[in-house]
């Protein structure tokens, strides 16, 4: 609520301020007089404005605790602004004001008096940084709309004049409520006199009033007025011409105003068109984003369909493999059945044979009791006969009983055999039933195969459909790739259009700038017209004054009176006197006439030159018009090309939208097909499971058959045992028969001995027949036994074959199990592949999301760029406003300068009047005529010079005005062409919009038709899916019926529970194992899911680490780039130090021994030979005078003083072993001696050859110069315990052609550094006095290693900025700054410093890039500067254009790389224009 109340109060205050402004403007218009402090509307305005300035202002205070107010805000904003600074300085000059509030009120009153309040406040509000630092967010000055409204209201006060006293009020307490009346008009206490040239109008007014008073006080009786009247007609003609020109200029001003309005309208229309184009670009960008999203979705769906197709193909291959395995298993099963049938047929035959043999045996057994009965009867008869004859022995009875028992045992065995035969028959029946069941199962399998055929056909058809879909997807991908290329082309074209748009905006800005420039020119022209009007008024006044003087002269020259004779006598007496006066007066008159004629000639010459300049300006204007017309034509061509590109873009966008719609429809159809494929895959999986169940049943049947084979083996073993038992019984029977035969023979023999008659023979015959029969039976039994043995052998062979077959079947089963394992592995591989595909899909989704994020970031970046462009445009607008305000301020200053020029002309008139007064004084004082004439001559010469200067200034102003007029004419000529172009562009834009609307309507209609087609296709696909689902349901029913039949078969096989128990147990175990495997698979899946999640987390972490690594890599690369030089330096230092350490360790003992002798010798040489700097002012060899450029150098051997060029030789000292500077004579002496192997001209280091320097070669100069210390302190060579950096620098500097060694710098005066910090201006001409052979800098440029070259121009140096730039100089290298200068007279200044140590500096001049380096001139030789301690300043004046190379040399340092911080400036020469005399 508080915020709303504050806002409502703020709005009310702004409305009150607006009402006060309107009241002030009305009061000024009605009264026609300036507004004073008596006005109540002024009181209201001041209070409201102060409230707004203090509203929501931050509380600030000074160090003393005084509160800061809006006066400090004005100072912070306007302290550096030209024009507004005058008011601030004026308020600060008022000592009466003590508080910040009073100073702010005085500044507001100053701005009202000078009509600058709106401009100053606008400049303050444009400085948003300072405003936000002084005000909170609720302030109206931080709200652009409210601030613009306030400034727009205050701009109405620029036309209102205020008459306010600058002093006399206590502004610290309150605003003044009444107007203070001044007592004297010239009192300076109540006048606004800001301390500046631009605002001092009171001095001009006072001087103008003084000139009028002086003109009115002139004496009209002077004879020089006649001379002044001679130029009156010419002045009148000039006035007429000026009036005509004024009319023309006014008409031109009106035309330019109209053209300016038209241009503003055209610019506004162009801005609207740009906004529409921006909106279209935004819509196109949104469409592109939507297209990219659709393309990403299509890619995802295509990847999903591709994965499904891959899985379908893999499943198809698995099904084919399973079908092949099933077919192979069926073939193996059929072959096994055939083998078993082939094996069963001989077994059946053998069983039939055994049955026949058993029947025969039964028959024999049935006949055997009869035979036994007959034998018993015979035995009874025999016993009767024997009993009659002899009693029968008891042993035969016992044997007979045993035979009976044996017969009973045989009967029992026969019954057992019959039971075995029955069991075998039952088993055969079971086998037959099983064969029937197998045949039924085979028939069902054949049915399933037949049913699978259409399914396979459907699968093949779906595979074809999938292939078609794949082809479509490939085509779609090709289309998408083509569309992506088109999108890329569209983006490129869009970028090109944006660039062209930016170019057009730049051209519009340039046009606006030209318009502003034209407006400023128009303002200047209007100002000039006003100045001409004022001059016209002054000339009219002068004309009136001259006419009055003429009338006075005519009155004085009236009719002669009666005193004529007396006057004639007096005249006759005065004739000689008059003649003498005329002779004395003729000379100045002639001189005055000569001056006037010279002035007329000058004016004529000026007019001719003005006409020529006008013609040249017209020609230039015509050329500019032609250029503008050409530019307009180019702009029209660009606009047409942009419009054509825009139409093509719209067409492409429409085509892309249509293709996207078709892609969406095709994607929907692909999704439906994918659903159908998933359903078919489910059906195939169900069929696969059914096949697995059938295979399990077949395995169970095979196991049952194996059990039956085992039973058969057991039966064969039992048969073998029975055959062996029978064989034993036969043997026992044979033995019994033999015993019986023996008994019979014994009996017969006994009977024969007893002499029995013929009946015994008969009985013997019968017994023999019986024996023969028994033998025959025995033979038959033996044959049967042999046959049974053969059968047993055959059965054993068959059993072996069956076992072999069983082994084969087991091997086949093992193969099948291996195939099943392979299938399982394949299934697992498929699962893993599926999971891998899912992972890849997830990764692709992540990549897509990342791409989307990148695209969003790109969009955000584009939005930021557009916002930055808008901000830049706003800043440019603000800058343009600032420039317009500055132009207005400059306009005001020009007006003030013109007023000054008018006052100067008035002063010239005063001087002319003074001349006339002096002439009258000459007539009155004839004695002083000669002196006064001389004084007049001097004054006339001075005045002539001033007039000539004024005429030159006026000519320059006239030329500038003519150029401005020409530019205005050119701009006016270009306006109608631009208007026509804008009209054509608007018509084209309207036509383009209409065409775009029509194309959009057609595209919408096409899209609706395509949508209807795809909907019908979707309905057909749905119907096909329904039919396929029905077929699948029928197949499921058939499968259910087959399963029911299988269950019935299982029910029939329930009787074989005992045999199948083992198989059921095995199956249960298998199922348990399967359950375990399923559980393990579930656990593995969970593990996989966990691992996937962990992998995703790991991938995210890896990506984060990768990003961090990338950042670290970039940082390391940057650091590596910075540290490469340091590493090279360290490697060099390492190698060099290793070498030097060995050398120094060797030389250490010798140095210890030589140190005392060296000190003693140096002291002797210093005492005996060393000369002070003041003892020699010229070089002792070449007699050149020492100066800053030619410095003093002591020879370290003889101690005399030479210049650098005469003392540029180095020789190894005898005691210290160091290279020291010496003169030519000492160098020749030492070189002739045998003890200086290294005394070469250049003084190369040991083991490092370097080019020798000639004695005349200009080397670097020592930094000591004139101020070298007379008390020379030699380097302390007695201390060699620690190898310091300075010693290493001495070693490395001794082998190079560099400026000086550290011993030299130590020996020089410390004032040398002060002399090096500032270098005087040098030119190429200054180097002509120097010797020619300056080889060290040129050798460095030729053979030295360049690190960095930074070419600069004068314009780049002019825009160098306030800060310094960095230049890197690696060790043993140098860096170069070539400055190309195209004009002479410039002054190039530099300031540089180095880090961490000093650096050498030199300047070399080169005429052009093609000139060889041998022809270059050394302006400043190589100088070692202590730039690491203080800034080195210097400057150079350019007298010949060319290339000035600033060389920063670091070749003397082999280990330390350095950074140079430099700042360059350019000063142009000041052209004297005589403005001091205005």
Swiss-Prot record:
The modification N-acetylalanine is found at residue 2. InterPro entries: FYVE_FYCO1, GOLD_dom, GOLD_dom_sf, Run_dom, Run_dom_sf, RUN_FYCO1, Znf_FYVE, Znf_FYVE-rel. The modification Phosphoserine is found at residues 196, 342, 878. Keywords: Acetylation, Cataract, Coiled coil, Cytoplasmic vesicle, Disease variant, Endosome, Lysosome, Metal-binding, Phosphoprotein, Zinc, Zinc-finger. Residues 36-169 form the RUN domain. Zn(2+) 2 binds at residues 1195, 1198, 1223, 1226. It is found in: Cytoplasmic vesicle, Autophagosome; Endosome; Lysosome. Residues 1294-1305, 1314-1324 have a biased composition (Polar residues). May mediate microtubule plus end-directed vesicle transport. Pfam families: FYVE, RUN. It comes from the Eukaryota. It comes from Homo sapiens. Can form homodimers. Interacts (via C-terminus) with MAP1LC3B. Interacts with RAB7A; the interaction with RAB7A induces FYCO1 recruitment to late endosomal/lysosomal compartments. Interacts with MAP1LC3B. Zn(2+) 1 binds at residues 1179, 1182, 1203, 1206. Residues 1337-1466 form the GOLD domain. A zinc finger (FYVE-type) spans 1173-1231. Expressed in heart and skeletal muscle. This is FYVE and coiled-coil domain-containing protein 1. Residues 586-613, 1231-1277, 1294-1332 are annotated as: Disordered. PROSITE patterns: GOLD (PS50866), RUN (PS50826), ZF_FYVE (PS50178). The modification Phosphothreonine is found at residue 381. It is linked to Cataract 18: An opacification of the crystalline lens of the eye becoming evident at birth or in infancy. It frequently results in visual impairment or blindness. Opacities vary in morphology, are often confined to a portion of the lens, and may be static or progressive. In general, the more posteriorly located and dense an opacity, the greater the impact on visual function. Residues 4-33, 225-280, 394-555, 596-1151 form a coiled coil. GO terms for cellular component: autophagosome; Golgi apparatus; intracellular membrane-bounded organelle; late endosome; lysosome; membrane. Gene3D superfamilies: 1.20.58.900, GOLD domain, Zinc/RING finger domain, C3HC4 (zinc finger). Residues 1231-1261 have a biased composition (Low complexity).
């Amino acid at each position: 609520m508080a915020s709303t109340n504050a806002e409502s109060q703020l709005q009310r205050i702004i409305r009150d301020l607006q009402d006060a402004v309107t009241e002030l403007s009305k009061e000024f218009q009605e009264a026609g007089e300036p507004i004073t402090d008596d006005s109540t509307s002024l009181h209201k305005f001041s209070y409201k404005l102060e409230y707004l300035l203090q509203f929501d202002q931050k509380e600030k205070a000074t160090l003393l605790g005084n509160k800061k107010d809006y006066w400090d805000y004005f100072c912070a904003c306007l302290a550096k602004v030209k024009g507004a600074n005058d008011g601030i300085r004026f308020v600060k000059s008022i000592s009466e004001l003590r508080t910040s509030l009073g100073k702010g009120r005085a500044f507001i009153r100053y701005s009202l008096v000078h009509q600058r309040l709106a401009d100053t406040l606008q400049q303050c509000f444009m400085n948003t940084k300072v405003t936000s630092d002084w005000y909170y967010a609720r302030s109206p000055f931080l709200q652009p709309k409210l601030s613009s409204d306030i400034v727009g209201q205050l701009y109405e006060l620029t036309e209102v004049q205020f008459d306010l006293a600058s002093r006399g009020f206590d502004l610290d307490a309150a605003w003044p409520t009444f107007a203070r009346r001044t007592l004297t008009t010239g009192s300076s206490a109540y006048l606004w006199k800001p301390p500046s040239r631009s605002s001092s109008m009171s001095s001009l007014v006072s001087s103008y009033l003084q000139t009028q008073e002086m003109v009115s006080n002139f004496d009209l009786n002077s004879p020089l007025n006649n001379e002044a009247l001679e130029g009156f007609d010419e002045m009148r003609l000039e006035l007429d011409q000026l009036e005509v020109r004024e009319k023309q200029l006014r008409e031109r001003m009106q035309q330019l105003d109209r053209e300016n309005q038209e241009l503003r309208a055209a610019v506004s229309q162009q801005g609207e068109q740009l906004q529409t184009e921006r909106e279209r670009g935004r819509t196109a960008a949104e469409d592109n984003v939507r297209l990219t999203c659709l393309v990403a979705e299509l890619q995802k769906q295509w990847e999903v369909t591709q994965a499904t197709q891959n899985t379908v193909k893999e499943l198809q291959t698995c099904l084919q493999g399973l079908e092949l395995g099933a077919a192979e298993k069926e073939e193996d099963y059929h072959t096994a059945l055939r083998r078993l049938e082939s094996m069963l047929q001989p077994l059946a035959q053998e069983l039939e044979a055994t049955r026949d043999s058993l029947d025969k045996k039964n028959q024999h057994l049935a006949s055997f009791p009869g035979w036994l009965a007959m034998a018993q009867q015979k035995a009874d008869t025999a016993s009767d006969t024997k009993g009659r004859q002899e009693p029968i022995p008891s042993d035969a009875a016992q044997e007979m009983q045993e035979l009976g028992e044996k017969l009973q045992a045989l009967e029992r065995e026969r019954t057992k055999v019959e039971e075995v035969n029955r069991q075998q028959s039952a088993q055969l029946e079971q086998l037959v039933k099983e064969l029937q069941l197998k045949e039924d199962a085979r028939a069902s399998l054949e049915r399933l195969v037949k049913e699978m055929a259409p399914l396979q056909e459907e699968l093949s058809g779906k595979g074809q459909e999938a292939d078609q879909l794949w082809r479509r997807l490939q085509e779609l991908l090709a289309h998408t790739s083509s569309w992506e290329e088109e999108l890329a082309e569209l983006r490129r074209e869009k970028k090109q259009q944006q660039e062209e748009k930016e170019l057009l905006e730049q051209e519009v800005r340039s046009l606006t700038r030209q318009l502003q420039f034209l407006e400023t020119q128009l303002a200047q022209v209007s100002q000039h017209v006003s100045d001409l009007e004022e001059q016209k008024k002054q000339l009219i006044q002068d004309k009136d004054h001259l006419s009055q003087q003429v009338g006075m002269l005519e009155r004085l020259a009236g009719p002669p009176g009666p005193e004529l004779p007396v006057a004639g006598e007096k005249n006759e007496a005065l004739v000689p006197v008059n003649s003498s006066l005329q002779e004395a007066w003729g000379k100045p008159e002639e001189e005055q006439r000569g001056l006037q004629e010279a002035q007329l000639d000058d004016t004529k010459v000026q007019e001719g030159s003005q006409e020529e300049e006008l013609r040249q300006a017209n020609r230039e204007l015509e050329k500019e018009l032609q250029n503008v017309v050409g530019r307009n034509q180019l702009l029209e061509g660009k606009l047409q090309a942009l419009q054509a590109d825009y139409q093509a873009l719209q067409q492409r966008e429409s085509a892309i939208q249509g293709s996207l719609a078709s892609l969406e429809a095709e994607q929907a159809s692909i999704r439906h097909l994918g659903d159908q494929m998933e359903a078919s895959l489910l059906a195939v999986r169900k069929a696969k499971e059914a096949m697995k169940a059938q295979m399990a049943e077949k395995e169970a049947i095979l196991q049952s058959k194996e059990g039956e084979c085992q039973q058969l083996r057991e039966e064969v073993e039992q048969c073998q045992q029975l055959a062996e038992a029978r064989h034993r019984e036969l043997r026992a029977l044979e033995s019994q028969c033999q015993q019986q035969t023996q008994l019979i023979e014994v009996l017969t023999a006994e009977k024969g001995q007893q002499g029995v008659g013929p009946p015994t023979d008969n009985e013997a015959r019968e017994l023999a027949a019986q024996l023969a029969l028994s033998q025959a039976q025995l033979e038959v039994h033996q044959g049967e036994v042999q046959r049974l043995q053969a059968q047993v052998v055959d059965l054993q062979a068959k059993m072996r074959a069956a076992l072999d077959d069983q082994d084969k079947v087991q091997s086949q089963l093992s193969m099948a199990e291996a195939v099943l394992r392979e299938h399982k592995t394949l299934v697992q591989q498929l699962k893993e592949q599926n999971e891998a595909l899912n992972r890849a899909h997830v990764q692709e989704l992540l990549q897509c999301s990342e791409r989307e994020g990148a695209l969003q970031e790109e969009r955000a970046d584009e939005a930021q760029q557009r916002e930055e462009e808008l901000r830049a445009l706003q800043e440019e607008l603000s800058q343009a406003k600032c420039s317009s305000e500055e132009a207005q301020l400059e306009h005001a200053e020009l007006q003030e300068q013109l007023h000054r020029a008018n006052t100067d002309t008035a002063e010239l008139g005063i001087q002319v009047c003074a001349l006339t007064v002096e002439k009258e004084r000459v007539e009155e004082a004839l004695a002083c005529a000669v002196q006064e004439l001389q004084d007049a001559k001097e004054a006339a010469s001075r005045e002539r010079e001033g007039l000539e200067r004024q005429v030159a200034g006026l000519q320059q102003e006239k030329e500038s005005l003519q150029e401005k007029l020409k530019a205005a004419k050119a701009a006016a000529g270009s306006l109608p062409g631009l208007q026509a172009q804008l009209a054509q562009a608007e018509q084209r834009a309207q036509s383009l919009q209409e065409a775009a609307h029509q194309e959009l309507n057609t595209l919408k209609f096409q899209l609706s038709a395509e949508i209807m087609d795809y909907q019908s296709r979707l309905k057909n696909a749905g119907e096909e899916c329904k039919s396929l689902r029905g077929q699948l349901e029928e197949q499921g029913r058939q499968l259910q019926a087959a399963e029911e039949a299988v269950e019935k078969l299982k029910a029939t096989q329930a009787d074989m529970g005992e045999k199948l128990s083992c198989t059921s147990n095995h199956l249960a175990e298998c199922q348990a194992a399967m359950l375990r495997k399923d559980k393990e698979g579930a656990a593995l899946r969970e593990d996989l899911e966990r691992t996937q999640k962990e992998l995703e987390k790991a991938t995210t972490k890896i990506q984060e680490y990768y990003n961090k690594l990338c950042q670290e890599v970039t940082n390391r690369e940057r650091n590596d780039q910075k540290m490469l030089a340091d590493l090279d330096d360290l490697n060099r230092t390492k190698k060099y130090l290793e070498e030097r350490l060995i050398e120094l360790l060797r030389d250490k003992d010798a140095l210890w021994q030589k140190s005392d002798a060296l000190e003693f010798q140096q002291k002797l040489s210093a005492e005996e030979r060393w000369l002070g700097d003041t003892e020699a002012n010229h070089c002792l060899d070449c007699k050149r005078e020492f100066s800053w450029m030619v410095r003093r150098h002591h020879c370290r051997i003889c101690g005399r003083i030479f210049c650098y060029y005469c003392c540029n030789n180095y020789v190894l000292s005898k005691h210290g072993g160091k290279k020291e500077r010496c003169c030519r004579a000492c160098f020749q002496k030492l070189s002739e001696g045998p003890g200086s192997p290294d005394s070469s001209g250049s003084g190369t280091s040991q083991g490092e050859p370097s080019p020798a320097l000639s004695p005349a070669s200009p080397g670097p100069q020592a930094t000591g110069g004139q101020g070298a210390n007379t008390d020379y302190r030699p380097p302390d060579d007695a201390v060699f315990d620690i190898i310091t950096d300075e010693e290493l620098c001495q070693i490395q500097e001794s082998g190079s052609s560099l400026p000086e060694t550290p011993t030299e710098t130590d020996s020089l005066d410390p004032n040398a550094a002060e002399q090096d910090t500032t270098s005087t201006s040098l030119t190429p001409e200054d180097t002509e006095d120097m010797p020619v052979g300056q080889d060290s800098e040129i050798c460095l440029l030729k053979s030295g290693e360049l690190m960095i070259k930074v070419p600069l121009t004068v314009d780049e140096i002019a825009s160098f900025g306030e800060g310094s730039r960095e230049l890197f100089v690696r060790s043993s290298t140098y860096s170069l700054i070539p400055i190309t200068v195209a004009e002479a007279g410039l002054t190039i200044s530099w300031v540089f410093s180095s880090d961490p140590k000093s650096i050498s500096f030199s300047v070399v001049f080169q005429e052009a890039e093609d000139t060889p380096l041998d022809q270059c001139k050394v302006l400043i030789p190589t100088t070692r500067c202590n730039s690491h301690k203080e800034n080195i300043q210097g400057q150079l004046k350019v007298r010949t254009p060319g290339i000035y190379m600033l060389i920063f040399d670091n070749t003397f340092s082999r280990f330390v790389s350095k950074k140079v911080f430099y700042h360059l400036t350019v000063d142009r020469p000041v052209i004297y224009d005589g403005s001091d005399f205005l």
